[in-house]
Structures are given as C-alpha cells and as structure tokens.
A protein has these predicted regions:
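Gly/Ser/Thr-rich phosphate-binding loop
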Residues: 183, 290-298, 307-371, 384, ...
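AMP-binding/adenylate-forming core of the ANL superfamily
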Residues: 386, 397-411, 430, 436-437
Length: 550
C-alpha cells in the first residue's frame, strides 16, 4: 500500500486492521451492526472499513459527494451505530455539514420510523436469502440506541449513531479522534479479535451499498461476504490481475468499482494499492510514472483525459498493461488509442450494478477491439442473463429488452424495503436491472439504455446510449449525452449535450448535418447544446436528470 511517503507491507496492513477491529469491539460493535465510512480514498478508509468488517460489522460506505442531508439520510436509513468521517475534504467540513443536517427534524425525509426490535433481515422480498443479521441482533442494536432517545447521541436527529470517529488528529466535542478510537482497543486481546473474525459466516452480509439514486432516493443493496469474494475472484481472474501489479485506485472506495474491484481484488491477488483521493489528470500521470503503475480501471472519460492531455508525452506510461472500463459509452477509437498509442496489452469493458455485486458481464482478454467497444462482454461464470419483454419472456438474440440477471451475486434484497425488493427480484430469483440490452449470437451483451431514458420519436424507440455511441464517432466530439425533449409533431425528439475537443469550432448545425448522414432520421438530435463538461456521479454515469432540468 502506497500513500504519499507512507509505504506499508501486507503484514503491516494486517496489523493495523486488527487494531481497528479491536477498537470496534471495544466500542461495543456487535456482529450485524452497521458501521459507515464517509471519507475519500485513503489508507485510513481501508483500515477503518476492514477493521469494522473484521469485527463482524456490516459496512455502509457513504458517497464523498454527498451533502450533509444526503449522508444523514443513509445513516438514518441504515441505522448505523458508528461513523468514520474525514475532517475536511475539498474545502468542505464533512463534520460541520453533517452536524447541521442531523439537527433537522426526522420527519421530512420520507423514512418510516424503525422502532426497537425491528428485524434487520426480515421482509427483504421473495426469492432471496437472509438479510442483515438476525432479528435478535437488530433488536439489541436498536434497543441500545433507542434507550438514549432521539437527539441524545453525538448528533441530534441520529439516535442510533452512538459514536462518530473523525479520521484526523482533532475532533469536536462528543466526537472521537482516530488516535483515541484506536487506543480504546489496546486492551482487547488479539485472540478475541481473531475469534470474532473467524466466526463470520460466508452468508452473513458484508456491506450495504446504497445505489447512486440517479432516478430517486438511494436504496441499500445487501451483499454477503461469499458473494463479494466470489465475484472479485472471478473479476481478478478475467482481468488478469496478478501478484506484483501496481494498481492506481482512482475509482472511489464508496463505490463497488473502487472498494471491491480495487481493495478486495488487490488483497486477494497481492497487488500493491496506490489510492488517489481525487481524479486529477496531472496527478494521475505523475503517479503512473513515479509508482510504475500497471493497472488503471476507471470510466472512459478518465482514460480519454489521459490520452488527450498535452503533457502526456512528458510522462513514462510504459508500465501500464491493464485497463478495465465501463459505466458509460466506450468509443471504439478509445480502445484503439489505448492499445495503439499507450501500448496497453489488455483493455476490457464490463457491466454491473450494485444489486448484482457490481459485476454481471465482462469481456475476455483476446477479444477484438470491436467487441470490447460495442459490448460489455459475456456473462461471468455462474451467471445467467435473460433479455426479457414486457411480460418477462425471453427474447432472441438481436432483440432489445430489459436485462434480467440470475446467479450467485444477486443481492439478498434492499435493506428493509420488501416492496422495492419484490419489484426488483422475481419470485424465482431473477433481478430486473432496469437496463435495456441486446445479446449478440456470441452471448455478448450490449447495453442500449436505461428503460426510463428511452424516448419515442414518431413511434420509433430511440435509445440515447446508441445515439451517443454514434455521435462519439465524430472527430470533434470529446463527450456527449442525449436526452428526450418534447416535440409538438413527433412527441419527443433527441437533444444532445456535447463537449467539443480542444480547438474545435464545430457548430450545432454541423453536428446535426453530420448526424443526418450517419444515422437513421429518428435518431438524429434536433437540438445540440455545447457544454464544458457533463454532470456525472462518482461512478462516471451521466446525471441525465440534471440535463433534463436545464
């Protein structure tokens, strides 16, 4: 593990994690309790998170882009007992913003009160396994918190949150510093920590990943230890991650791509972790050269920015050998440039979602560039994919429908949300993803869009992702997103929000004229707006609701 001048071995990391686990036990954390982490990609995130999990807790990662109100929502929804939080990040005091948000009344967030004795693992929906802990465990945690009464913990309005640990040397009154927290576990014998870790069952929940909420309030997908380990052993094998690799982890730890395809994959394969708290092209280029980085997963925009950086030639990027990307349209030209200009041996695309452990399909090493760019690869071992019509019936290859997934990685359910779970998972265990896709004869999956993003132009179904892929072929387009807008004659038409390449003088009329030559008429955007950048969430997905609201 490398963080600036700090370099620690796996043995040293293990010792730090055990100490954090001892501190969690000393703080009263019991198996099944939820522990949240709200911090950027740092060594302290890794140690605090793995320490909590080793103590039997269920990890609840919080998005670093959250405001205080959003963080408080997840903390209330999960009833987290312990929170690890960074002090100040990117000029924002997380502690202050959370304190302000937690002081508001509880009734305005649409949550149902969860009284003492509520079984955390009950009612997650049909066709799914056990949820988070047992009813007794949940009752114990809730009774402890409930005895304090609303607003009597360190943060008013978060009665279940008993302790807040600031990952810094200083902490406000009623909070604890990281140093003080760790010292609290020094009296816990190492054997106690190891017994606690050894008692964790494979089918026990390891984490609750709250979905990005691009279409509504976040919901928590419950994933088990066995699911996480099996998924990312498969991911590591298909990607070719190996001992000795040096992995620049730019994907945020609060996201499956950073936590599981990053931290867990490195731990299982013995790769060196080099976390980067914020993506900055100059910093990434410097890190790749200085740390001899060999592995760099991330969204397509990350790799595009590296390729287009004017100072790229001043950095030695020759050690890069593996790129895994996805979460957005991947232009064929991007794959070709990564292979041709940077000589990266393995460039792969993949598809996944939190509700399926973050991985469903993946290209294979040796796939041609056209397959890697145009599809997200084939189902991982142990997974079945169905392209379903509106009645749930399987469609043949080449026809678009909703992607359904069945396999070892499908979530146990949404945390304490039986109605939403029943909507997402069929009684026989199929997960409805909400994504529109097509399977080719070789079993490769092409995601054409979200069902809710599709719009209808004069009776024709228009899929923004397909149109974006075509627009991305224009030599002056660096990034693009398409949404449907009302039209008095056709019902809806497409509008493109485009980012021009540096130095381009491309006009809206130019792009529309080009589109008429390159795609069917109903796909042609009727309006184009050029922007400096597209709004994206931390996983790289375009926030189309923000574009529609403009």
């Amino acid at each position: 593990m490398v963080e600036g001048r700090t370099r620690i071995t796996y043995g040293q990391l293990g010792a730090r994690v055990e100490r954090a686990a001892a501190a969690a036990i000393a703080a009263g954390i019991e198996p099944g309790d939820r522990v949240a982490v709200w911090a950027p990609n740092t060594l302290d995130w890794i140690v605090s998170a793995l320490g909590a999990v080793s103590a039997g807790a269920v990890l609840v990662p919080l998005n670093t882009r959250f405001k205080g109100t959003e963080a408080a929502y997840v903390l209330r929804r999960s009833r987290a007992r312990l929170l690890f939080v960074t002090g100040t990040f990117l000029g924002t005091s997380y502690v202050a913003s959370l304190r302000r948000a937690a002081g508001h009344a509880l009734d305005g967030d649409g949550l149902e009160a969860a009284g003492p004795g509520t079984g955390v693992g009950t009612g997650v929906g049909p066709g799914v396994g056990p949820g988070v802990g047992t009813g007794a465990e949940a009752a114990g945690a809730d009774t402890r918190a409930g005895a304090r009464g609303p607003g009597r913990g360190p943060l008013p309005g978060l009665p279940h949150l008993e302790q807040v640990v600031v990952l810094a040397d200083d902490a406000p009154a009623d909070f604890r510093t990281w140093k003080d927290f760790l010292a609290g576990g020094d009296a816990v014998p190492a054997e106690t920590v190891r017994r606690r870790a050894a008692a964790i069952r494979p089918e026990a929940p390891s984490d609750i990943i709250f979905t990005s909420g691009t279409t509504g309030s976040p919901k928590g997908a419950v994933i088990t230890h066995a699911q996480s380990l099996r998924c990312y052993e498969v991911w590591s094998e298909l990607a070719g991650l190996r001992e000795g690799d040096r992995y620049l982890i730019v994907n945020p730890f609060f996201h499956t791509f950073g936590y599981k395809a990053g931290i867990l994959a490195c731990l299982m394969r013995g790769a060196t972790m080099v976390p980067q708290p914020v993506f900055n092209v100059d910093t990434a280029l410097a890190n790749i050269a200085a740390e001899r980085i060999s592995v760099l997963p991330g969204p397509p925009t990350l790799h595009q920015s590296l390729l287009d950086h004017p100072q790229r030639g001043h950095h030695d990027l020759s050690t890069l050998r593996l790129v895994v990307t996805g979460a957005a349209v991947v232009p064929l030209r991007l794959v070709e440039r990564l292979r041709g200009e940077l000589h990266i041996a393995t460039v792969l695309t993949a598809y996944g979602l939190s509700e399926a452990g973050g991985i469903v399909t993946m290209c294979r090493r040796g796939d041609p560039a056209e397959v890697i760019a145009a599809t997200s690869g084939r189902a991982i071992p142990g997974t079945r994919i169905r392209i379903a019509d509106g009645d749930g019936k399987a469609l043949p290859a080449g026809e678009a429908g909703e992607v359904w997934v069945s396999g070892h990685h499908v979530m146990q359910g949404y945390f304490e949300a039986p109605a939403e779970t029943a909507e997402a998972i069929t009684p026989d265990g199929w997960l409805r993803t909400g994504d529109v896709g097509v399977l080719d004869p070789g079993g490769n999956l092409r995601i054409t869009d979200r069902i809710k993003d599709m719009f209808i132009v004069g009776g024709f179904n228009a899929y923004p992702a397909e149109i974006e892929q075509l627009l991305g072929l224009h030599p002056d387009i660096a990034d693009v997103a398409v949404v449907g807008i009302p039209d008095p004659r056709l019902g809806e038409v497409g509008k493109a929000y485009a980012v021009r390449r540096p130095g381009s003088t491309l006009t809206a009329d130019d792009l529309i004229a080009w589109s008429r030559r390159e795609m069917a008429n109903y796909k042609v955007p009727r309006a184009v707006e050029f922007v400096a950048e597209l709004p994206r969430n931390a996983s790289g997905k375009v926030l189309k609701r923000e574009l529609r609201a403009r």
